[in-house]
Amino acid sequence: MSDYKIWVDADACPNPIKEILFRAAERKALPLVLVANQMIRVPPSPYINQIRVGAGFDVADQYIVDHVEPTHLVITADIPLAALIIEKGALALNPRGELYTVDNIKQKLTMRDFMEDLRGSGVHTGGPDSFSQADKQAFANSLDKWLVRV
């Protein structure tokens, strides 16, 4: 089981998702590493660690990319980070329960870039819906599917 690990792009990860991950790490005796450029409160546990990286653009992302392995799962809403994780053969799951895959990541990147271009030209595109109980449940279900394989 020591080959498996969960990484969290923790700066923007919703607290309810962190709580689910804390419980899963304890239940499965599975290493969980939260990477952020600020201190993140984590419960005392031999399985849960927090890595604080320096401030700067994508510093936490790069730390995760540098350390992830194919048997690992990365929790992130950052689509470019998810693409890098997939290139390294690992899995990426967003906090709303959607698994990023080789089959869908190019489309996700294209849509992200398109929306960014629209915003850059002054078009108001809105943001994602508020994080909901349904999102939390979808994440828990997706995580459980991965944990069954561990």
UniProtKB/Swiss-Prot annotation:
Segments crossing the lipid bilayer: none
CDD domains noted in UniProt: PIN_YqxD-like
InterPro entries: UPF0178
Family under the similarity heading: Belongs to the UPF0178 family.
Protein name stated in the entry: UPF0178 protein Sbal_1771
